[in-house]
Amino acid sequence: MALSQSVPFSATELLLASAIFCLVFWVLKGLRPRVPKGLKSPPEPWGWPLLGHVLTLGKNPHLALSRMSQRYGDVLQIRIGSTPVLVLSRLDTIRQALVRQGDDFKGRPDLYTSTLITDGQSLTFSTDSGPVWAARRRLAQNALNTFSIASDPASSSSCYLEEHVSKEAKALISRLQELMAGPGHFDPYNQVVVSVANVIGAMCFGQHFPESSDEMLSLVKNTHEFVETASSGNPLDFFPILRYLPNPALQRFKAFNQRFLWFLQKTVQEHYQDFDKNSVRDITGALFKHSKKGPRASGNLIPQEKIVNLVNDIFGAGFDTVTTAISWSLMYLVTKPEIQRKIQKELDTVIGRERRPRLSDRPQLPYLEAFILETFRHSSFLPFTIPHSTTRDTTLNGFYIPKKCCVFVNQWQVNHDPELWEDPSEFRPERFLTADGTAINKPLSEKMMLFGMGKRRCIGEVLAKWEIFLFLAILLQQLEFSVPPGVKVDLTPIYGLTMKHARCEHVQARLRFSIN
């Protein structure tokens, strides 16, 4: 009698639960694709029924999957819910998949959160990877290059990007001086994001946004509402029931995407009212002109209604990635003043104090370039590429990978792989310099991974690197950044599509000298 009272379940209930467990197990096993003879499935750690490995991933999936790769290898499989996910680690394996077998791995999985971005029409996130997608990607790449890194015949600057960044960096220095004269401190992210958004706004629309534009400021200062939900491994993409439960983060994500799309639609429409095909001055204008060239049957031309989708991808990626990189750079500099002094010594020696840095100075500033590369590597603020998927049945390192398999590419693991990097947890820009310290060690720099690889490599990679370099060169030439004694700076990354550091509102900037 006492024993029966201590057991909360009856024998019948236990048998029923066991039967259900076995049924679920066999159903899930039956859903697994048949592996062709002579091949094998990737190794898979034990996971919970129905849940898979979602609990194992925790709050930092990039770290959890890096630990798994140490035990199970470069190619492993996990399950999030009932969905199999291939996880790729280590540089050689990732390069084999995304470059040498690029056509096999160029797809995107059909994820719920991706359908909420630009109404599911995003060039970056959509599942499309066919000829029309490839043609539009080339079009976006060409338009971006034309109004960023190409030369501007009407300007003394080397290119449009240099002109826009120089103007915005000068305005940012003035704004930081005003803040130092007032409150005496500032949050660098909130200040940098406005300047970076103005640069991409000038390239996309030929205009800078006024500081009084509350609409624009609200969007660019709240990108965390996007990156926290668009991250790899979000349970929303793998457990459909979660979409119908109260979820403040999902509601913020939906609202942000709707506001952002509406803002861009309105801006593009206003731009169209003034469009002159004989005077194309920005990316949107170039897309308008291309849309009017003739029939679209080949897929090489883009309908006007699709232009906003391309602009959304270019604008969105153009300010978040660059802002995050510059913000991380400033956080490293205030915690490592000796590195800041080395950069400023290099700037003083190469450029002096009579003019501002230019993009042409980049080869003569190897230590600054090494610092930027080390910031990319150490923070790995893009821990995963946007998820890939396989476009057909394929093999990788002897493992069978079925068509439409979701693929996570762990960039953080590559950037912290002890086989590639000596003391990977240490922040040391010198690792990227040649032995004599006069140039970048190019073979090593090419092992750092932040912008993806292959057919889905970020189209704005060159633009981002040039922009980050020029912003930092101009800022560090004229300003010295610090935090007051006793203020602790938290450099722990906060997981998301792009990982941010904890906000720091106590950064200070002292003017070294001014340039008219």
Curated annotation (Swiss-Prot):
Pathway given in the UniProt record: Cofactor metabolism; retinol metabolism; Steroid metabolism; cholesterol metabolism; Lipid metabolism; arachidonate metabolism
GO biological process: one example: cellular response to cadmium ion
Cofactor: heme
Residues reported to bind heme: C458
Binding site for substrate: F226
Mutagenesis / variant outcome for changing P42R: In allele CYP1A2*15
Effect seen on changing D348N: In allele CYP1A2*3; increases N-hydroxylation activity of heterocyclic amines; reduces phenacetin O-deethylation activity
GO cellular component: endoplasmic reticulum membrane; intracellular membrane-bounded organelle
Main location: endoplasmic reticulum
Description of what induces expression: By nicotine, omeprazole, phenobarbital, primidone and rifampicin.
Tissue: Liver.
Catalytic activity, as annotated: an organic molecule + reduced [NADPH--hemoprotein reductase] + O2 = an alcohol + oxidized [NADPH--hemoprotein reductase] + H2O + H(+); 17beta-estradiol + reduced [NADPH--hemoprotein reductase] + O2 = 2-hydroxy-17beta-estradiol + oxidized [NADPH--hemoprotein reductase] + H2O + H(+); 17beta-estradiol + reduced [NADPH--hemoprotein reductase] + O2 = 4-hydroxy-17beta-estradiol + oxidized [NADPH--hemoprotein reductase] + H2O + H(+); estrone + reduced [NADPH--hemoprotein reductase] + O2 = 2-hydroxyestrone + oxidized [NADPH--hemoprotein reductase] + H2O + H(+)
Keywords: Endoplasmic reticulum, Fatty acid metabolism, Glycoprotein, Heme, Iron, Lipid metabolism, Lyase, Membrane, Metal-binding, Microsome, Monooxygenase, Oxidoreductase, Steroid metabolism, Sterol metabolism
Membrane topology designation: Peripheral membrane protein
Record CDD domains: CYP1A
One Pfam family here: p450
Impact after mutating G299S: In allele CYP1A2*13
Repeat is among the record's keywords: no
Glycosylation sites noted in the Swiss-Prot or TrEMBL record: S69
Family matches, as InterPro entries: Cyt_P450, Cyt_P450_CS, Cyt_P450_E_grp-I, Cyt_P450_E_grp-I_CYP1, Cyt_P450_sf
Signal peptide region: none
Family: Belongs to the cytochrome P450 family.
The name this protein goes by in its record: Cytochrome P450 1A2
Organism field: Homo sapiens (Human)
